[in-house]
Swiss-Prot record:
Its EC number is 6.3.4.2. Residues 290-532 form the Glutamine amidotransferase type-1 domain. This is CTP synthase. The gene is pyrG. The keyword ATP-binding applies. It comes from Pyrococcus horikoshii (strain ATCC 700860 / DSM 12428 / JCM 9974 / NBRC 100139 / OT-3).
Length: 537
């Protein structure tokens, strides 16, 4: 019988419920149990696709084309698995289904209500995924007490009643602040948060107490007493240097063992050796390289979370720590490329719209002319084509029709199948598509195979009418779409140290033990470039 672990959050948002949920999933998987993670987002949006990265962070793209919350990226990285769009349950999806059923007459004239109809649909979606797994970790987004979360918490309460207490556990993530004035950790916010949860009929089985420093014994005892949670199940999750340390911290605190016992499962020795090795290696890195990320959402770095993580993975594989220099593309427009001086590598990531586009083009020109290791992603790939057209081929005013519909040289154009769409949500070229790689190229040396599947999220593409002109001028298109060879996927400049751009998002498939090849290559090239600079100085 499938076991369920619900993870809720209290006091404030942004405590790291996603990392806690991913860590619990890893601890269960490390014990040999078939485990998956589900994220519940209580917003009314159907998916994360049309959300502003400033508000919500990055939109993570799955193999099946699902545009989902960034927490699913953490789940995939921690559990080394590929999830589906169904693993992200939103209020929008739930209500859509219920309203469709009502319109079809499936409720036989009943008054459709939150209980039972909405809660039944939530439970149905969770159970549908659970069929194939021993353990399902379900993170309920938001904070206990939010009006949006109520139906989901009620559905979770009902599931414990229906599945049996030994099959459903609740983990509550809270915040324990330390007031500088008195110098002690305060448990009152946690007490109130649990009180709120209990008023909804849910008694947490374990409490993950987030704090700056390790939880003091006095605070632990107090939380246990006032929340009716055993002392061994009050877990100290203090701030660590890197999120990949969290599973090891929770395991040391005994959370994995406690949940296994609570769910009446056989406790097995967790195999975390590879994970421990990876964390130790990352922490021990001394040598550094600095890589600039020039984007339009850099004020909220979570907008580029998967890129940050992919650089971390490539740090471990190259024995060098990456320091990121965050640069707003508009600042390049205003202050020039001097903001890039001294960097060992440059990334121009994805993004939509005109704001900052010229700054990104200036950045690409700087990388190309100064032979600095460079990686362009999605919009960064398209703007690399624009920069090359303008500054190498002399096509004055060349642009993407996304930015300038009247450009004399539309070197990047809307894909034909995108031309008559009325809806924005879920209509891009989304998800994993095959990419054919040409032998004898940088891309082939990185991937070491001729066919790869990478995740996409775009409407525009390189205009096939200009490909011949680009290739004559020395630009190599080393990867094309497996389903349409006129669709360009990877470009490179062979005469440069490392200059590559991809139409797809390689960061979405990067994993701690298997870094994305183009990121591994970028960090390696940045390391070699820095060594060269140091040798000549």
């Amino acid at each position: 019988m499938t076991k369920f672990i619900f993870v809720t959050g209290g006091v404030v948002s942004g405590l790291g419920k996603g990392i806690t949920s991913a860590s619990i999933g890893l601890l269960m998987k490390a014990r040999g149990y078939k485990t998956t993670n589900i994220k519940i987002d209580p917003y009314i949006n159907y998916d994360a696709g049309t959300m502003n990265p400033y508000q919500h962070g990055e939109v993570f793209v799955l193999d099946d084309g699902g545009e989902v919350d960034l927490d699913l990226g953490n789940y995939e990285r921690f559990l080394d698995t590929n999830l589906t769009f169904e693993h992200n349950i939103t209020t929008g999806k739930v209500y859509s289904t219920v309203i469709e059923k009502e319109r079809r007459g499936e409720y036989l004239g009943a008054t459709v209500q939150v209980i039972p109809h909405i809660t039944d649909e939530i439970k149905r979606r969770i159970r549908e995924i659970a069929k194939d797994y021993d353990i399902v970790v379900v993170e309920i987004g938001g904070t206990v007490g939010d009006i949006e979360s109520m139906p989901f918490l009620e559905a979770a309460r009902q599931m414990q009643l229906e599945e049996g207490r030994e099959n459903v556990a609740f983990v509550h993530v809270t915040y324990v602040p330390k007031l500088k004035v008195v110098g002690e950790q305060k448990t009152k916010p946690t007490q109130h948060s649990v009180k709120e949860l209990r008023s909804l009929g849910i008694q947490p089985d374990a409490i993950v107490a987030r704090s700056e420093d390790p939880l003091e014994e006095e605070a632990r005892k107090k939380i246990s007493l006032f929340t009716n949670v055993p002392r061994e199940a009050v877990v100290s999750a203090y701030d660590v240097e890197d999120t990949y340390e969290v599973p090891l911290l929770l395991e040391r605190e005994g959370l994995g063992k406690y949940l296994i016992k609570r769910l009446k499962l056989e406790d097995r020795e967790p195999d975390l050796r590879e994970w421990e090795k990876m964390v130790a290696k990352y922490k021990a890195l001394k040598e550094t390289v600095e890589i600039a990320i020039v984007g339009k959402y850099v004020k909220l770095t979570d907008s580029y979370l998967s890129i940050k993580e992919a650089l971390k993975h490539a740090s471990v594989s190259n024995d060098v720590k990456v320091k990121i220099r965050w640069i707003e593309a508009e600042d390049i427009e205003e202050h020039g490329t001097k903001l890039l001086e001294g960097v060992d590598g440059i990334i121009v990531p994805g993004g939509f719209g005109a704001r900052g586009a010229e700054g990104k083009i200036m950045t690409i020109k700087y990388a190309r002319e100064n032979d600095i290791p460079f990686l362009g992603i999605c919009f960064g790939f398209q703007l690399t084509v624009v920069e090359f057209a303008r500054n190498v081929l002399g096509m004055k005013g060349a642009h993407s029709t996304e930015i300038d519909p009247q450009t004399p040289y539309p070197v990047v154009d809307l894909m034909p199948e995108q031309r008559n769409l009325e809806k924005l949500g879920g209509t891009m070229r989304l998800g994993a598509y095959p990419v054919k790689i040409k032998k004898g190229t940088l891309a082939y040396r990185l991937y070491k195979k001729e066919l790869v599947y990478e995740r996409h999220r775009h409407r525009w593409e390189v205009n096939p009418d200009y490909i011949e002109a680009f290739e004559k001028a020395g630009l190599v298109f080393s990867g094309v779409a497996g389903d349409d060879e006129r669709r360009m996927e990877i470009l490179e400049l062979p005469d440069k140290r490392y200059f590559i751009a991809t139409q797809f998002h390689p960061e979405f498939k990067s994993r701690p033990m298997r870094p994305a090849p183009v990121f591994h290559g970028l960090v390696r090239a940045a390391k070699e470039y820095k060594q060269e600079k140091n040798a000549t100085n």
